[in-house]
Amino acid sequence: MWRWSTGVRTMLGYAMCFLALGSALTVRLHSTRTNLPQYLTREIGDDEFEELLRSSASAGHKWHVEQFVDGSRCYVPETEQNMAPVPDDLLERGIKLVEEATVGKKLEYLPISYWGYKFINSELNKTVIQHKDQHQVLLGSMVKADPQTVQHSLERDEDSYYISERFGDGDLCSLLEEDRTVEVQYRCKYDTPLEIILDLKEYETCRYTMLVSIPSLCELPEFGPYTRQTPANTIYCTAPATPEFNIATLVEAYKPTFLGHGFYHLAPHANLTHKETTAMLMYHQQPIPGNEEDDGTMDSAFIKHSTMAYMQLLEMGLLNGPDGLPFSEEGNFTVYAKVIGFDGGLITVTRFQISHGEVIIDHVVPEVLEDMEQGNSEDYEQQAPEQLDEEEAELTSQSDDPAIMRVHLQEFITPEYDAIE
């Protein structure tokens, strides 16, 4: 049966936390401890942690515990932070500085990934665009003259204030059947002499946060760091269940490609001789349910997310046929892929088919692939059908189950490539 060594599981777990670092800017997710407020953090043992909970309860302190997928827990005190008072016109003055710094400009952000991003501030409106070659997706826009679309506010984090603007009216998101939206945060950053986009994250499906540095905001001390008047509280955390390892090991062995929707594609570097599968995905969001009592809702969401990840693989030319050429949406093919968690453990095996313009994706019982210790996506296509007859193995879901995604290809491939991200 297909197994991961302890070292590889540990390696992938640390790498997943490293790759997902900073994945939330304004929302608190519970996937990694990096999403906690930037207070003082101290690591303690499990016994000391339990004693801290008991003593805090006895003393009547306000606190809560965050549980993370790496097995660690954090004690977070619920003490309101005192910020320096601000002038009533601070938001108005800040917006004026932002406008003066960005009007008539187009800021571009080209991370090491498939998509690039643009922030455009014209005389009439502001827009945020996701693009690749000739394909564009509108993430959000704001008409300056329309009070209904202008949504800006003065916000604060642990150390300073910033300006937040929310753009609606993005392109339709097929998964949510709603328009995309993006929040743009304008911040003072002393180490950036020009107006630049610092980051863009999709913190939820079709919901984005863009971080823009506006150096002129630093002229107003309230937007600078360290405006908090009281010292930070201490957050106490237990150690992760996954031991640390050298991140260089993963970099030497695999090339991770972020596909969106919680998925990474892991491909061995071309200069290596090992034959690990190229049809291998890593999923770092909530795992799919494993008990029979679950109503299948999360499983259905996982299928939708994995379908989008496969479509992204297809669009990027990372799914190849036996001839070495990339599959295309016009062809008919089947690909089997192992899906692992951030700890390297096997979550499931998925089957992805395109047949006569229809996309079909479902789970396959992992045990049916126990003879496939090595191979690539072409081997899966050739070998798996022989092992998947109905007498030897059953699919985890039948065709009328919501966990099977069966849609027409044109719902994913549109002229604007709206649904591929």
Curated annotation (Swiss-Prot):
Q: Which UniProt keywords apply?
A: Disulfide bond, Endoplasmic reticulum, Glycoprotein, Lectin, Membrane, Signal
Q: Which GO terms describe its molecular function?
A: carbohydrate binding
Biased segments, Acidic residues type: 375-394
Domain (MRH) ranges: 99-220
- Where is the segment annotated Disordered? 375-403
* Membrane recorded as keyword: yes
Q: Where does a mannooligosaccharide derivative bind?
A: W115, R180, E202, Y208
Give a GO biological-process term.
retrograde protein transport, ER to cytosol
Q: Name one Pfam family in it.
A: Yos9_DD
Q: Which GO terms describe its cellular component?
A: endoplasmic reticulum lumen; endoplasmic reticulum membrane
Record has Lipid metabolism as a keyword: no
InterPro entries membership: Man6P_isomerase_rcpt-bd_dom_sf, MRH_dom, OS-9-like, Yos9_DD
Q: How does it sit in the membrane?
A: Peripheral membrane protein
* Compartments where located: Endoplasmic reticulum membrane
- Annotated signal sequence range: 1-26
Q: Which cysteines are joined by disulfide bonds?
A: C173-C206, C188-C218
Glycosylated residues (UniProt) = N125, N271, N332
Q: How does it assemble?
A: Interacts with missfolded ER lumenal proteins.
What's the family? Belongs to the OS-9 family.
- Known role: Lectin involved in the quality control of the secretory pathway. As a member of the endoplasmic reticulum-associated degradation lumenal (ERAD-L) surveillance system, targets misfolded endoplasmic reticulum lumenal glycoproteins for degradation.
Q: What is this protein called?
A: Protein OS-9 homolog
